[in-house]
Amino acid sequence: MDKQEAKHINMPSPSACEYKSVEAYLFIDPLCKDCWEIEPFIIKLWLEYGKYFSIRHIVTGKVDGTNASSHKWNKPANIRFVWEKTTSLHGFSYDGKVHMQEASSTPYLVSMAIKAAELQGRKAGSKFLRKLQEYIFLENVSNPDCELLLACAKDSDIDVEEFKKDLYSASAKKAFQCDLKFTNEMHITEIPSLVFFHANSDEEGIKIAGTYSYDVYVQLLKELVKCEIEPEPLPSLEVLLEATQFISSKEVAFIYDCSKQEIERELKKLQLKRKVQMIDVKCERYWKWIAKEKDLV
């Protein structure tokens, strides 16, 4: 647990390596469990190497198979494919447009909600997405409706009235259309997929489809940065819980590279201090921060 000694996240000034020199795009379907389970990888990568890259979630938006067109590649994607699985577990097809006949469907409404939340900032969008996924996968909500989306907005501490206005707005619709177009251009055929680009280079990007070991993502980041990069110390357990608000023992153990037993001993100490609440859901133990929220970044 040595890595937990750092009390705050202090990003040092850039030296030989360019600050935020890599742009990462995580292509997701919010209703896909695999896209939820990759989040601990992204959190850990951001905590350790966040000074080298920025990240943005791209909502893919599945199209019903009976209405979906075949792929129409508008232009060749300047991207290199690595370790892409030969069989897609979540196959779907795009033509880069929002299908308005799907406007009342759950996938469309959920995608619009994420874009509406993002209009209040990228952090707001990420918080909303995580809260939405908790409802879907922990409380078995298969068809999120408007009422639940508003509850997610409230729980995410974003401006609910602004969210209501944006949910069916032209701005949210345009943002979703841009995500679909970008998904099409990047030839995304499996979710989750992570695409890396160097921000100041015309070199090809790198795409990895599916979920792999954490070391693979670090290796790809190092390849793009093109200089020796070192991980930052991880924040204290309290800082992590304060930022995520709700997280499982399994996720925390992965982030700190410790056993669940060791992590839960530390978490129970926080429970005794009345800083977290233990919640058992579906044979997994979760921890809810019950003090005031504080952002990691």
Swiss-Prot record:
Keywords: Cytoplasm
Subcellular location: Cytoplasm
InterPro entries noted in UniProt: Adapter_SpxH, Thioredoxin-like_sf
Entry keyword Cytoplasm: yes
Cellular component GO terms held in the UniProt record: cytoplasm
NADP in keyword set: no
Subunit (UniProt): Interacts with Spx.
Reported function: Adapter protein required for efficient degradation of Spx by ClpXP under non-stress conditions. Interaction with Spx stabilizes Spx and exposes the C-terminus of Spx for recognition and proteolysis by ClpXP.
Family statement: Belongs to the SpxH family.
Record protein name field: ClpXP adapter protein SpxH
Taxonomic path: Bacteria, Bacillati, Bacillota, Bacilli, Bacillales
